[in-house]
Amino acid sequence: MRCGNNLKQIGLGQLNYEGVYGKFPAGNRFGTSAALDRPGGLVDILPFVEMESLFKLYDLNAPPNAQVFPGTTKLLGSTVVQTYICPSDTDPATNSTNGMAKSNYVASGGSGAQINNPNCSCTSANFNTYALGPYDPSATANPNGVYSRRGYQARIADITDGLSNTILFGETRPSCSNHANSGWGAANGGQGLASTIYPINFFSCNNADTDGCKRPCNWSTELGFKSMHVGGANFLFGDGAVRFLTESVDHTMFQRLGAKADGQAVTLP
Protein backbone atom coordinates (compact mmCIF):
# COMPACT_ATOMS: atom_id res chain seq x y z
CA MET A 1 0.00 0.00 0.00
CA ARG A 2 2.82 2.41 0.70
CA CYS A 3 3.81 2.55 -2.96
CA GLY A 4 0.26 3.53 -3.89
CA ASN A 5 0.19 6.07 -1.07
CA ASN A 6 3.39 7.63 -2.41
CA LEU A 7 1.76 8.06 -5.79
CA LYS A 8 -1.29 9.58 -4.13
CA GLN A 9 0.98 12.12 -2.42
CA ILE A 10 2.61 12.93 -5.74
CA GLY A 11 -0.87 13.28 -7.21
CA LEU A 12 -1.88 15.72 -4.49
CA GLY A 13 1.31 17.64 -5.20
CA GLN A 14 0.53 17.80 -8.92
CA LEU A 15 -3.09 18.85 -8.41
CA ASN A 16 -2.29 21.38 -5.67
CA TYR A 17 0.43 22.88 -7.87
CA GLU A 18 -2.11 23.13 -10.68
CA GLY A 19 -4.56 24.75 -8.30
CA VAL A 20 -2.03 27.44 -7.39
CA TYR A 21 -0.47 28.09 -10.81
CA GLY A 22 -3.25 27.09 -13.20
CA LYS A 23 -1.12 24.43 -14.89
CA PHE A 24 0.74 21.26 -14.01
CA PRO A 25 4.50 21.28 -13.36
CA ALA A 26 6.75 20.63 -16.33
CA GLY A 27 7.80 17.02 -16.70
CA ASN A 28 11.32 18.24 -17.33
CA ARG A 29 13.21 21.32 -18.44
CA PHE A 30 15.85 19.98 -20.79
CA GLY A 31 17.81 22.82 -22.35
CA THR A 32 19.69 23.00 -25.62
CA SER A 33 22.86 22.62 -23.55
CA ALA A 34 23.63 21.32 -20.06
CA ALA A 35 24.05 24.91 -18.88
CA LEU A 36 20.42 25.59 -19.80
CA ASP A 37 18.90 22.56 -18.03
CA ARG A 38 16.59 23.48 -15.16
CA PRO A 39 15.08 21.45 -12.29
CA GLY A 40 12.06 19.36 -13.28
CA GLY A 41 8.62 18.55 -11.99
CA LEU A 42 9.52 16.51 -8.91
CA VAL A 43 11.46 19.53 -7.66
CA ASP A 44 8.49 21.83 -8.30
CA ILE A 45 6.16 19.83 -6.06
CA LEU A 46 8.54 19.53 -3.08
CA PRO A 47 6.56 22.17 -1.11
CA PHE A 48 3.42 20.09 -1.68
CA VAL A 49 4.94 16.82 -0.38
CA GLU A 50 6.19 18.29 2.92
CA MET A 51 9.69 19.05 1.61
CA GLU A 52 9.49 22.85 1.45
CA SER A 53 12.77 23.29 3.34
CA LEU A 54 14.61 21.37 0.61
CA PHE A 55 12.78 23.27 -2.12
CA LYS A 56 13.87 26.61 -0.67
CA LEU A 57 17.51 25.63 -1.18
CA TYR A 58 17.00 25.17 -4.92
CA ASP A 59 17.81 27.83 -7.48
CA LEU A 60 15.19 27.21 -10.15
CA ASN A 61 17.27 29.25 -12.61
CA ALA A 62 20.37 27.07 -12.34
CA PRO A 63 21.19 23.63 -13.82
CA PRO A 64 20.27 20.72 -11.49
CA ASN A 65 23.80 19.34 -11.43
CA ALA A 66 25.12 22.69 -10.21
CA GLN A 67 22.90 22.65 -7.12
CA VAL A 68 24.78 22.11 -3.85
CA PHE A 69 24.08 22.62 -0.19
CA PRO A 70 25.56 25.94 0.99
CA GLY A 71 29.17 25.45 2.02
CA THR A 72 29.36 21.86 0.81
CA THR A 73 29.78 19.93 -2.40
CA LYS A 74 26.79 17.66 -1.81
CA LEU A 75 24.19 17.74 -4.54
CA LEU A 76 20.73 18.69 -3.36
CA GLY A 77 19.48 15.90 -5.58
CA SER A 78 21.34 13.37 -3.43
CA THR A 79 18.74 13.88 -0.69
CA VAL A 80 16.56 10.79 -0.40
CA VAL A 81 12.88 11.77 -0.53
CA GLN A 82 10.97 8.81 0.87
CA THR A 83 7.78 9.79 -0.96
CA TYR A 84 9.66 9.20 -4.21
CA ILE A 85 10.80 5.66 -3.35
CA CYS A 86 8.78 2.47 -3.70
CA PRO A 87 9.62 0.12 -0.79
CA SER A 88 9.39 -2.87 -3.14
CA ASP A 89 12.50 -1.68 -4.97
CA THR A 90 15.37 -3.08 -2.93
CA ASP A 91 18.11 -1.44 -5.00
CA PRO A 92 20.19 1.32 -3.32
CA ALA A 93 18.43 4.64 -2.75
CA THR A 94 21.23 6.58 -4.45
CA ASN A 95 23.19 6.09 -7.65
CA SER A 96 26.69 4.86 -6.76
CA THR A 97 28.18 6.72 -9.74
CA ASN A 98 26.73 10.22 -9.40
CA GLY A 99 25.30 10.17 -5.86
CA MET A 100 21.84 11.27 -7.00
CA ALA A 101 18.85 9.92 -5.06
CA LYS A 102 16.45 7.83 -7.08
CA SER A 103 12.77 8.19 -7.80
CA ASN A 104 10.60 5.18 -8.59
CA TYR A 105 7.94 7.48 -10.03
CA VAL A 106 8.09 9.24 -13.39
CA ALA A 107 5.73 11.42 -15.39
CA SER A 108 3.89 10.14 -18.43
CA GLY A 109 5.11 11.55 -21.71
CA GLY A 110 2.19 9.89 -23.48
CA SER A 111 2.14 7.29 -26.22
CA GLY A 112 4.88 8.83 -28.33
CA ALA A 113 8.55 7.89 -28.26
CA GLN A 114 10.38 10.09 -25.77
CA ILE A 115 13.93 10.23 -27.07
CA ASN A 116 16.16 9.20 -29.98
CA ASN A 117 17.66 5.74 -29.61
CA PRO A 118 21.25 5.54 -30.89
CA ASN A 119 22.32 2.85 -28.42
CA CYS A 120 21.68 -0.86 -27.96
CA SER A 121 19.97 -1.92 -31.16
CA CYS A 122 16.61 -3.59 -30.63
CA THR A 123 16.29 -6.96 -32.39
CA SER A 124 12.92 -8.16 -31.10
CA ALA A 125 10.76 -5.11 -31.90
CA ASN A 126 10.97 -1.62 -33.33
CA PHE A 127 9.40 0.17 -30.41
CA ASN A 128 10.06 3.65 -31.76
CA THR A 129 7.34 3.05 -34.38
CA TYR A 130 4.98 1.04 -32.19
CA ALA A 131 3.07 3.96 -30.75
CA LEU A 132 -0.33 5.35 -31.54
CA GLY A 133 1.08 8.78 -30.80
CA PRO A 134 3.63 10.75 -32.85
CA TYR A 135 7.38 10.56 -32.41
CA ASP A 136 7.85 13.95 -30.81
CA PRO A 137 10.55 13.79 -28.12
CA SER A 138 11.14 17.54 -27.97
CA ALA A 139 7.54 18.76 -28.01
CA THR A 140 7.09 22.15 -26.41
CA ALA A 141 3.67 23.26 -27.64
CA ASN A 142 1.22 20.38 -27.29
CA PRO A 143 2.79 16.95 -26.69
CA ASN A 144 0.82 13.73 -26.81
CA GLY A 145 0.97 13.22 -23.02
CA VAL A 146 0.46 15.52 -20.07
CA TYR A 147 4.22 16.08 -19.74
CA SER A 148 7.24 16.53 -21.99
CA ARG A 149 10.97 16.99 -21.50
CA ARG A 150 11.06 20.53 -22.92
CA GLY A 151 9.20 22.49 -20.26
CA TYR A 152 5.63 22.13 -21.53
CA GLN A 153 3.02 22.67 -18.79
CA ALA A 154 -0.47 21.28 -19.39
CA ARG A 155 -3.68 22.75 -18.01
CA ILE A 156 -6.60 20.64 -16.85
CA ALA A 157 -8.53 22.00 -19.85
CA ASP A 158 -5.94 20.40 -22.15
CA ILE A 159 -6.78 16.91 -20.87
CA THR A 160 -9.90 16.50 -22.98
CA ASP A 161 -9.95 12.71 -22.68
CA GLY A 162 -10.87 13.17 -19.03
CA LEU A 163 -8.75 13.17 -15.89
CA SER A 164 -9.89 9.69 -14.86
CA ASN A 165 -8.78 8.30 -18.24
CA THR A 166 -5.33 9.88 -18.40
CA ILE A 167 -2.13 8.70 -16.73
CA LEU A 168 -0.08 11.37 -14.96
CA PHE A 169 2.62 9.26 -13.31
CA GLY A 170 3.65 5.64 -13.01
CA GLU A 171 6.43 3.47 -11.68
CA THR A 172 9.92 2.90 -13.00
CA ARG A 173 13.01 0.92 -11.99
CA PRO A 174 16.02 3.27 -11.94
CA SER A 175 18.50 0.38 -12.08
CA CYS A 176 16.94 -0.65 -15.41
CA SER A 177 17.17 2.76 -17.07
CA ASN A 178 20.20 4.87 -17.93
CA HIS A 179 17.96 7.94 -17.65
CA ALA A 180 15.86 7.18 -14.58
CA ASN A 181 18.99 6.30 -12.60
CA SER A 182 19.98 9.97 -12.68
CA GLY A 183 17.51 10.71 -9.90
CA TRP A 184 14.52 12.87 -9.08
CA GLY A 185 16.52 16.11 -9.34
CA ALA A 186 17.81 15.60 -12.88
CA ALA A 187 16.49 17.32 -16.01
CA ASN A 188 18.53 16.02 -18.94
CA GLY A 189 16.88 14.28 -21.87
CA GLY A 190 14.40 11.59 -20.95
CA GLN A 191 15.01 11.72 -17.22
CA GLY A 192 11.81 11.86 -15.23
CA LEU A 193 9.58 10.60 -18.06
CA ALA A 194 8.24 7.32 -19.39
CA SER A 195 5.99 6.30 -22.26
CA THR A 196 3.00 4.01 -22.67
CA ILE A 197 4.46 2.68 -25.92
CA TYR A 198 6.21 -0.14 -24.13
CA PRO A 199 4.38 -2.95 -22.33
CA ILE A 200 4.26 -2.70 -18.54
CA ASN A 201 7.30 -4.31 -16.90
CA PHE A 202 9.06 -4.83 -20.23
CA PHE A 203 12.46 -6.10 -19.10
CA SER A 204 15.36 -3.69 -19.72
CA CYS A 205 17.62 -4.66 -16.83
CA ASN A 206 20.25 -6.96 -18.33
CA ASN A 207 23.44 -5.17 -19.39
CA ALA A 208 24.85 -8.41 -20.80
CA ASP A 209 21.87 -9.38 -22.97
CA THR A 210 22.58 -9.68 -26.69
CA ASP A 211 19.18 -8.15 -27.45
CA GLY A 212 19.55 -4.41 -26.97
CA CYS A 213 15.83 -4.15 -26.19
CA LYS A 214 16.51 -5.72 -22.82
CA ARG A 215 19.37 -3.47 -21.73
CA PRO A 216 19.28 -0.23 -19.68
CA CYS A 217 21.12 1.59 -22.47
CA ASN A 218 18.25 1.14 -24.94
CA TRP A 219 16.83 4.64 -24.97
CA SER A 220 13.40 3.36 -25.97
CA THR A 221 12.53 0.39 -23.79
CA GLU A 222 14.22 1.78 -20.67
CA LEU A 223 11.67 4.60 -20.74
CA GLY A 224 8.76 2.24 -20.20
CA PHE A 225 6.80 1.94 -16.96
CA LYS A 226 8.03 -0.94 -14.80
CA SER A 227 8.11 -2.03 -11.20
CA MET A 228 9.22 -4.71 -8.77
CA HIS A 229 5.58 -5.68 -8.17
CA VAL A 230 4.50 -9.04 -9.52
CA GLY A 231 2.27 -8.79 -12.54
CA GLY A 232 2.03 -5.04 -13.10
CA ALA A 233 2.66 -1.53 -11.79
CA ASN A 234 0.89 1.34 -10.05
CA PHE A 235 -0.28 4.39 -11.97
CA LEU A 236 -1.53 7.82 -10.93
CA PHE A 237 -4.41 9.22 -12.95
CA GLY A 238 -5.42 12.82 -13.43
CA ASP A 239 -8.27 12.62 -10.95
CA GLY A 240 -5.79 11.64 -8.21
CA ALA A 241 -6.77 7.97 -8.23
CA VAL A 242 -4.06 5.29 -8.12
CA ARG A 243 -4.71 2.08 -10.03
CA PHE A 244 -2.70 -1.10 -10.44
CA LEU A 245 -2.54 -2.02 -14.12
CA THR A 246 -1.52 -5.56 -14.98
CA GLU A 247 1.01 -6.62 -17.58
CA SER A 248 -1.84 -8.23 -19.52
CA VAL A 249 -3.75 -4.96 -19.98
CA ASP A 250 -4.84 -4.40 -23.57
CA HIS A 251 -1.87 -2.63 -25.10
CA THR A 252 -3.81 -0.31 -27.39
CA MET A 253 -5.87 0.84 -24.42
CA PHE A 254 -2.68 1.34 -22.37
CA GLN A 255 -1.28 3.61 -25.05
CA ARG A 256 -4.52 5.59 -25.15
CA LEU A 257 -4.37 6.07 -21.38
CA GLY A 258 -1.06 7.86 -21.96
CA ALA A 259 -2.56 10.34 -24.41
CA LYS A 260 -4.40 13.31 -22.95
CA ALA A 261 -6.48 14.35 -25.94
CA ASP A 262 -6.70 11.64 -28.60
CA GLY A 263 -10.49 11.42 -28.40
CA GLN A 264 -10.44 7.63 -28.10
CA ALA A 265 -12.73 5.87 -25.64
CA VAL A 266 -11.17 3.60 -23.03
CA THR A 267 -12.66 1.16 -20.56
CA LEU A 268 -10.50 0.51 -17.55
CA PRO A 269 -10.45 -3.08 -16.27
Model regions: which residues?
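Conserved hydrophobic/amphipathic alpha-helical signal-anchor segments
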Residues: 1-57, 242
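Short, well-ordered junction/capping motifs at the entry into regular secondary structure
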Residues: 20-38, 74, 213-232
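Extracellular/periplasmic head regions of type IV pilus-like filament subunits
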Residues: 31-88, 152, 162
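Short, solvent-exposed loop/turn segments at the edges of secondary structure
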Residues: 38-41, 79-81, 100, 228-230, ...
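Residue-level detector of short, conserved catalytic/binding motifs and their immediate flanks
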Residues: 8, 43, 81-84, 103, ...
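Hydrophobic alpha-helical interface faces used for helix-helix packing
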Residues: 64-67, 90, 103, 108-269
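Short, solvent-exposed loop/turn and secondary-structure capping segments
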Residues: 3, 27-29, 57-60, 95-101, ...
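Active-site-adjacent helix/loop patches that line small-molecule binding or acyl-intermediate pockets
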Residues: 87-97
